[in-house]
């Protein structure tokens, strides 16, 4: 009889705990929805500081809100890039990558900023990550080829250039680089490479409203 009573008590406590967790989850979801609404309103006004703050609070309460935070961080990061606030831009893209590490576009955006401050080693790493995620994107090979050439690594620069031409045989930038690299190999003379013409995509995919 005592064993039966103890078992009943344990089951009752477990039920109460489950109900409490469900109630708390429901409360958190409602609170997250409120912050999310504030974030969308800030987004419409292009107030990225407020949007990031609101979506961050929402994501802390409900992980389903994380994509909205990722989008807001990218928008603010690109705004920082435009304003030449490069450390702040890198910080936002880095936070976005912690939440979505499989997004090649974010690696590209961070690498673009790293190139702006001549941090070529980090940019090289980020473009390599982008290539792993999107191995058929010609632009990534062109950028990485440019970095290799800037660092004096003609062999790897040529390898990426040839990969770009394999993906896009008519790519004029790749053709010009290959000609220049071949001349450099022949003359064994360091020639300063012109920067690539392409740039990161204009904006991240906007998160849909719930």
Which residues does each PLM region occupy?
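Canonical tetratricopeptide repeat
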Residues: 71-75, 109, 143, 177
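Position-specific recognition of the canonical hydrophobic site in helix A of tetratricopeptide repeat
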Residues: 36, 43, 74, 81, ...
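Helix-start (N-cap) detector for alpha-helical repeat units in TPR-like alpha-solenoids
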Residues: 32, 66-70, 104-105, 138-139, ...
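Conserved structural position within tetratricopeptide repeats
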Residues: 57-60, 64, 95-98, 129-132, ...
């Amino acid at each position: 009889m005592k064993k039966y009573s103890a078992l009943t008590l344990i089951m009752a406590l477990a039920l109460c705990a489950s109900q409490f967790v469900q109630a708390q989850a429901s409360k958190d979801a409602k609170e997250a929805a409120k912050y999310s609404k504030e974030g969308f309103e800030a987004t419409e006004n292009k107030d990225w500081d407020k949007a990031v703050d609101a979506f961050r609070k929402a994501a802390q309460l409900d992980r389903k809100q994380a994509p909205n935070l990722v989008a807001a961080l990218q928008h603010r990061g690109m705004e920082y890039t435009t304003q030449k606030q490069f450390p702040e831009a890198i910080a936002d893209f880095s936070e976005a990558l912690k939440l979505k590490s499989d997004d090649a576009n974010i690696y590209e955006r961070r690498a673009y900023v790293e190139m702006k401050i001549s941090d070529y080693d980090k940019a090289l790493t980020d473009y390599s990550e982008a290539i792993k995620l999107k191995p058929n994107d010609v632009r990534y090979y062109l950028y990485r080829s440019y970095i290799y050439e800037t660092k004096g690594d003609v062999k790897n620069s040529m390898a990426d250039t040839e990969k770009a031409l394999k993906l896009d045989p008519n790519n004029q930038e790749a053709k010009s680089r290959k000609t220049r690299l071949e001349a450099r190999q022949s003359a064994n003379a360091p020639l300063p490479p012109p920067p690539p013409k392409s740039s990161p995509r204009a904006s991240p995919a906007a998160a849909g409203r719930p």
